């Protein structure tokens, strides 16, 4: 799977936040989309039970098959299920064997290096024919955000972890920025096919596949079309064996037929919950919860926390919806993470007045009865009235005007709470006189 370590070797402007917010689809759905654009893929169908997997295998009428767990994570082949089964991609040779492996996958969590120890639930398997491959290639189209155009990333070392290839043999990675156009110039595809080393018999098919994959990327508002491997078979056909398609969430209004296929079970439940109420929330690995309005201010808040030795627990942009209901939901999401040791509220009041935000904040904090420190910085319209409201509330909300000072205090409080938890003691905070 194309992830951050590969992108570091590509232009710098790939934002992890933008990547994470894009719609990702299961392999079997991606294959269906590719088929509609005339791209050749192996025959196959999804199954949601062992019985269905057996039927699909029989209907394919071949003895060389593969059963693939459908989870949105890389490293499936080397993963392990909580059922004890090793490997989320298993070759099988008859329908009975397909059923056996499907039953050990469906309803179980697959743990890979990308899912972490929690794993991801497998609700569907993809049963498809297995092809005899002469050569495997890697091919992807994604957005070059620095140059504001599509970019091809390709390699003649496909079928393996592209991150490993990029780390061990960076010269094997081909990158090319493309002009913004509804169609790919076939000459660009021909040049790439020559560099990758397709056989002369398969070159026309490879060019055709690449041109059509670009059409998928453009027409579907995709942010990434990744094929690994793009395979040349022993009979010189060119097939997209495994496909990962990501789509721009901002284009949902144009592609409701695609976005309706989103599998919420594969997404972080807190992030999915936040999206439903219009909050832009992304979990991170730190322990200082952040509640901010505006993506730019949210990024700056995380930067200054890290500058002072802290680690943000989340990215949370409430946007222009910083009312009591949004703040309540935001606090609920932040405190749902047991790692959180402090909460930094950093709001700039423009159209929404600071005193209104302060009243909403006080209402939420009073109801939640939190035992972790809250550091608050409200700047903008009616900021003086907001500070007065907070100071008169009697709640332990630490209010600051200066961003740097507020960030330092958040980091210090966080360390105090962390040390108290390690020592298994309670700690309380009082406002200075």
From Swiss-Prot:
Required co-factors: Mg(2+)
Catalysed transformations (reactions): succinate + ATP + CoA = succinyl-CoA + ADP + phosphate
Cofactor binding: number and manner: Binds 1 Mg(2+) ion per subunit.
Principal subcellular localization: mitochondrion
Residues at which Mg(2+) binds: 228, 242
InterPro entries (alphabetical): ATP-grasp_succ-CoA_synth-type (IPR013650), ATP_grasp_subdomain_1 (IPR013815), Succ-CoA_synthase_bsu_CS (IPR017866), SUCC_ACL_C (IPR005811), Succ_CoA_ligase-like_bsu (IPR005809), Succinyl-CoA_synth-like (IPR016102)
Residues the record lists as binding substrate: 293, 350-352
Targeting signal (transit peptide) range: 1-23
Cystine pairs: none
Biological-process GO terms, alphabetical: succinyl-CoA metabolic process; tricarboxylic acid cycle
Alphabetic keyword roster: ATP-binding, Ligase, Magnesium, Metal-binding, Mitochondrion, Nucleotide-binding, Transit peptide, Tricarboxylic acid cycle
Gene3D superfamilies: ATP-grasp fold, A domain, ATP-grasp fold, B domain, Succinyl-CoA synthetase domains
Binding-site positions, ATP: 68, 75-77, 136
Compartments where located: Mitochondrion
One Pfam entry name: Ligase_CoA
Documented EC number(s): 6.2.1.5
Pathway listed: Carbohydrate metabolism; tricarboxylic acid cycle; succinate from succinyl-CoA (ligase route): step 1/1
GO terms under cellular component: mitochondrion; succinate-CoA ligase complex
One Gene Ontology MF term: ATP binding
SUPFAM superfamilies noted in UniProt: Glutathione synthetase ATP-binding domain-like, Succinyl-CoA synthetase domains
Ranges of residues in domain ATP-grasp: 31-273
HAMAP family documented for this protein: Succ_CoA_beta
Similarity annotation: Belongs to the succinate/malate CoA ligase beta subunit family.
Job description of the protein: Succinyl-CoA synthetase functions in the citric acid cycle (TCA), coupling the hydrolysis of succinyl-CoA to the synthesis of ATP and thus represents the only step of substrate-level phosphorylation in the TCA. The beta subunit provides nucleotide specificity of the enzyme and binds the substrate succinate, while the binding sites for coenzyme A and phosphate are found in the alpha subunit.
Subunit composition and interactions: Heterodimer of an alpha and a beta subunit.
The protein's name: Succinate--CoA ligase [ADP-forming] subunit beta, mitochondrial
Source species: Schizosaccharomyces pombe (strain 972 / ATCC 24843)
